[in-house]
Amino acid sequence: MSHLKQLRTRIKSVKSTQKITKAMQLVSASKMAKIKNQIANSNFYIEAISKMMSDIVSIDMYELSIEEQKFFNTIPNKANLLIVMTSQRGLCRTFNYSIIKQVKNDIKELENKGEQIKLIIIGKKGYEALKRQYANYIDSYFELPNIHAENLMLQVKQKIMSLVVNLEVSNCVIYFNKFKNAMTQIMTRQQVLPVEKDHDDSKIENDHYEYEGENLISNLINLYVNSQINYALLQSRASEEGARMTAMENATNNANDLISKLVLKLNRSRQAIITTELIEIVAGSEAV
């Protein structure tokens, strides 16, 4: 009987866990759908800003102020800024692993070249994975908020702008997972600074911009850096929720399979006990 009690207790426990994983799956699915809409709504704006910035590279750099030129030119003997975007929480499969692996490989390559490195880490999981080995490279660490991330984007943008203007860094690369679908996230290494020229020169020849107004280029640089952070953050969050949704779906299915096996085991044990009791009753009646 104690064996049956243990099985019933375990079935109850697994069912309770299944309810939690199912709820987490539904929450992640809802969040992912919302973020996908945000990505769709912001794509045109981000592409337009990036296009204008790449076109500026084709103009004479002497038309820009000294501070503005720092965002378009690689300055020798300055640190490489690596922005690492990971998750704040776990339970999202290998979401963070591919990012951390690529960052470590790139750091090793930069170290072999004798180059300086600075890290900006966004998300607790990335910080925990890198702080022990690369604590001396970490310039800033930001926790990822559950909702509204406007303040986070502002802080990261200000930090990047400050490092570039003060000639502490030259190259800036951001690492994040790009969303493809709920089951597939693509590890992405995207250069933010210096701004790269559009490789399709025909586009630049066909478009013409007149840059007028005080601080117009500086304002555009601000918008560009902010848009790059926003793009990476949205992609990363959609990927994280997709990975978590898939992980929780798998956990829910596994729990369901385990419950079926435990119920079958419980029924067989009960049948065995009943059979034994019947045999004992029959044997007792025959003895009488």
PLM feature spans:
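C-terminal beta-strand-loop-alpha-helix "lid" module of Rossmann-like NAD(P)-dependent dehydrogenases
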Residues: 1-288
